[in-house]
Amino acid sequence: MPARRLEKICLICCRGGSKTIKNKNIKNFLGKPLIQRSLENILKSKIFDRVILSTDSKKIANNAKKFKIEIPGLRPKNLSTSTSHQFDTHKFIFKKLNINDKNSIVCVYNNNPFIKSNLIKKSYKLFKKNKFKGLVVDASKVDGDYIASKQYKLEKKIFYLHRNKFLKLSLNRQT
């Protein structure tokens, strides 16, 4: 039996219940819903074998369906609060879809419309070159208590998580 090819997987966690801007992930930003901008750039990068959206919102899921990505049902409410940790959502999705850590897994924050496909490509190349176990891509400058401020910054605008630090550093609010 031939060895199974490892997959390149992109996971986007997209919560419906934003405390600051109601329905922010489906609000228009420069003419397009926020989630659409992220999905277009992820797909334009042509890196991933699978793009998976984890959400608790029917509206977000319906908005994303036209992109023919995987939406494995709505995630449980306990993984969708403002204090839920993304790492718990990742574990839930990986278990549900039988994804193991031998695959290349990249998490892209959906609520930043400035993540362009070239940044995703550049990030992925560095990710593979350095043999990191996980990657989080975000295009914002990090100051203060922003979600990505708990990740290591190795290069401007590109954030990596080492496997031995992932649990500790991934304890942040859902986006």
Name these PLM-found stretches.
Residues 2-22:
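N-terminal nucleotide-binding beta1-loop-alpha1 segment
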Residues 8-9, 49, 70, 103, ...:
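Conserved acidic residues
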Residues 36, 51-55, 137-139:
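Short internal beta-strands
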Residues 10-12, 53, 107, 134-137:
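Structural beta-sheet core signal
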Residues 52, 58-106, 114-115, 122:
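Short phosphate-binding loop-to-helix
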Residues 83, 88-89, 101-104, 110-175:
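Conserved core of the sugar-phosphate nucleotidyltransferase
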Residues 34-50:
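A short, N-terminal amphipathic alpha-helix
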